[in-house]
Amino acid sequence: MRNLMTGCLLAAFLCAASCGCSKDNGGGEEGGQVAGVTVKPAYNKSEVLHNPLNGWVMYVSADYDPSYFDKEIYVPLLGKNVRVADYASACYIRTKWSVLNPADGQYAWKDPDSKVYKLVQKARELKLPIAFRVVVDGRDQGANTPQFVYDAGAEYAMSEPKYPDRKTPMPQDPIFQRYYEKFVAALAEEFNDPEYTSFIDGYGLGKWGEGHSVAYNKDDVSAVDENTETVKREVLDWITKLYAKHFTKVPLVINYHRVLGHPTSQGTANPNSESLVALAISNGYCIRSDAFGMNNSSWGYSTWEKAIAAQWRYKVPIIMEGGYIVSSHSYWNDPAGYRQG
């Protein structure tokens, strides 16, 4: 049977080869010339075409004035100031859920008087795609989840009683999830468009929305018990599927953190973090790091992070965010050990 199959394949190959070697050059039996068509493409020599998820990202706060897009920096090699927005591939807005959704059914991107609306319109005018991360945890910051969600009965922790607006919502709470689902659906109605949106940073839980220090216990934000691993996996699966359901045309990303979804913020990588990253990817996500260039072994970009990037390299896009950048001294004298050149 194997010899018969080999013979058939060989015969098919020889037949194809003999056809390919025909003396007929396409001119027909009389050997006439084939009429040609001259094509003259209309080239656009001025507009820059950016590949998706390539290039530099311009960070913009949701409370900035649109004039921020006119910010210039001096480039020594050019010997002149240049407008940063002209060299950016995306505009990254990391902001609060409460800013984007101040009241139930009200959205800042629909309010012409809001700064968010004005920033979005300016970015679109500049043809600068937007990226969002929506932060819900109020620790270190303030009222990140809208008050109407808590008024409806959503559970929360308050780890800093002297700052009553710094509430931490419980992401497994059904009331929280109901309002968050409504918000994500509305966000997608406006921004599920690759012409205007570069990517959505679709997790946003934990401190600063970075995916670590995620609390599941309203009495103790650092509590870890026998149910923690199950709950954090269920929450990550819920939120990534939620974004994937509504954002079908733009990339979704998640921070590949060593303690992703865990109540802690640093230390040895959690044994389940790798599988959580894989779960997010299976739900349609790409990955990004918030700590690129930070070489601290407990919370920076170290062995575990490099291994995750190597594992998924060439399989999904990987976005890097440079960690804190020095401003008071030279990069090359920084303890982080940046390499020059």
What residues fall within each predicted segment?
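Catalytic-core regions of glycoside hydrolase
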Residues: 36-75, 87, 124, 128, ...
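Sec-dependent bacterial lipoprotein signal peptides
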Residues: 1-19
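Active-site groove signature of glycoside hydrolases
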Residues: 155-222
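Short, charge-rich amphipathic segments
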Residues: 34-47, 110-120, 129, 157-175
